Amino acid sequence: MRIGLLGGSFNPPHQAHRAISLFALKRLQLDRVWWLVTPGNPLKDNGGLHALAERAAAARKVAADPRIEISCLESVIGTRYTADTIDYLRRRASRLRFVWIMGADNLAQFHRWQKWQHIAAQVPIAVVDRPPRSFRALNAPAARALARYRVAEADASRLADRAAPAWVYLTGLKMSLSSTGLRNPDGSWKSF
């Protein structure tokens, strides 16, 4: 089984998360996408972060597709770092083929993630374009360091079968929604 992993705060979850997941299911020929709702992002201020259970419940409503599963795994296993989560999943579910899914905005700062090289060495990565962030993302330190492992977009459907490091930059999905844009100044969620 081929599983896409989409990690995030989901504060709040929104239609772009769903659109990215459906896009990845199709373009990467995945069987499922798991939304890994994090207890807290180590690179962000978590002061306005809603309760994990509230974010997971909202994510289930937004996902609205049986191929998208919502998980609070990081809370269960007691980690907040993607590298540790991926190591755990690879040990516990070695028969599954995982692909890490991220937006171009995350590729632009991927070099700041704990053990980012380890993540890239453990699972293939699919980066979904988020204009106008394309240029910055593709010229970021991690993108430059991993340039020789980039897979042609035409071969994206076979990414899950490739040994890491391997990554693809997917274009064609145009969604400008962001969780930041859906939060009020006090941290409450706007209607969506």
From Swiss-Prot:
Claim: Nucleotide-binding is one of the keywords in the record: yes
Enzyme class name: transferase
GO MF annotations, alphabetized: ATP binding; nicotinate-nucleotide adenylyltransferase activity
Entry keywords, A to Z: ATP-binding, NAD, Nucleotide-binding, Nucleotidyltransferase, Pyridine nucleotide biosynthesis, Transferase
Listed EC numbers: 2.7.7.18
Superkingdom, taxonomy of origin: Bacteria
InterPro entries: Cyt_trans-like, NadD/NMNAT, Rossmann-like_a/b/a_fold
Record bears the keyword Thylakoid: no
GO BP of this protein: NAD biosynthetic process
Catalytic reactions on record: nicotinate beta-D-ribonucleotide + ATP + H(+) = deamido-NAD(+) + diphosphate
Signal sequence, renumbered to the chain: none
Pathway terms, separated by semicolons: Cofactor biosynthesis; NAD(+) biosynthesis; deamido-NAD(+) from nicotinate D-ribonucleotide: step 1/1
Known role: Catalyzes the reversible adenylation of nicotinate mononucleotide (NaMN) to nicotinic acid adenine dinucleotide (NaAD).
Family: Belongs to the NadD family.
Name assigned to this protein: Probable nicotinate-nucleotide adenylyltransferase
Origin organism lineage: Bacteria, Pseudomonadati, Pseudomonadota, Alphaproteobacteria, Hyphomicrobiales
